[in-house]
Amino acid sequence: MKLDYARYSERFGALTINSVQHVHELDSGNAEYHRSRTVAQISERELYDMYNRLAVVVPVKNERLKLLEGVISGIPHDCLVIVVSSSSRNPVDRYKLERDTLKHHVLLTDRDVILVHQKDPELAHVFEALNYPYILDGRMVRDGKGEGMLIGLLIAKMMGKEYIGFIDSDNYIPGAVNEYVKIYAAGMLISESPYTMVRIAWRYKPKVAQGGLYFAKWGRISEYTNRYLNMLISSHTGFETDVVKTGNAGEHAMSMRLAELLDYSSSFAIEPYELVYMMEEFGGVLESRHADAMYE
């Protein structure tokens, strides 16, 4: 793979926010490559080594089974797949259908997939035992995408993975999912910090408009989220910026060392809140609880 090194960055205290880094080739071939100062080349060997250290979490709720199967099939074989379901159990047990679909996939591919239901009472008991009641609603884990992602993160940590990625289950193109994971791996490999997050700006999720497909540059909510996050950065630095392009990125990944330091929001606020929290914690706005990480 060939992709840009960061060409433009904003500094927010100890936090570095890079502008979008473009991928020039998903497969850069076997020819010898002389590294330049602006373009990084990642070999297949390096990517496959990273896949073994990466878990990919797929939150799902009542999604079409063909879509879920397509997403799983697009994830590289050596990644650990963790599916966190919040699908309904009646009148049709959607979770059982998901389990049957994944069992068939595992039988055919001989790969590692972990499936868990967000409302499993045993999960709630685990959080009670860990003295983490914030995720509970009564005696069950709350509904919400953020809660599902946190469950997946904890499973990945339990399995000893060094990196964790998230992919939405509503992706229609399995090949795009494969691209996401390659970009996660490449982004981690070229990073110089052990506290790294990679967020994807992928502009090929079309919308149906006036009987055809329309490729919007930004989603409606993303446009607002990006604008206000950039305003927050500008108010701190004193210079206007548009560096944030992925405020609502469901497709993102991070090192486990960073994931262990973050606080998380509930439901669909989780993706933008990750950025807000890092600005607060590592931007010098508030006294940091993780001062050591600010030097790395």
Residue ranges and their predicted role:
Residues 1-28, 268-296:
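C-terminal catalytic/acceptor-binding lobe
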Residues 1-74:
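N-proximal low-complexity "stem/linker" segments adjacent to membrane-targeting elements
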Residues 92-161:
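Active-site-proximal specificity loops/subdomain of glycosyltransferases
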Residues 85-88:
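Acidic ATP/Mg2+-coordinating residue in the GHKL
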Residues 161-174:
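Short beta-strand-to-loop acidic/aromatic patch adjacent to the donor-nucleotide binding site
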Residues 46-49, 70-81, 100-108:
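Short, acidic, metal-binding catalytic loop of nucleotide-sugar glycosyltransferases
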Residues 146, 247, 256, 268-276:
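Conserved glycosyltransferase catalytic-site signature
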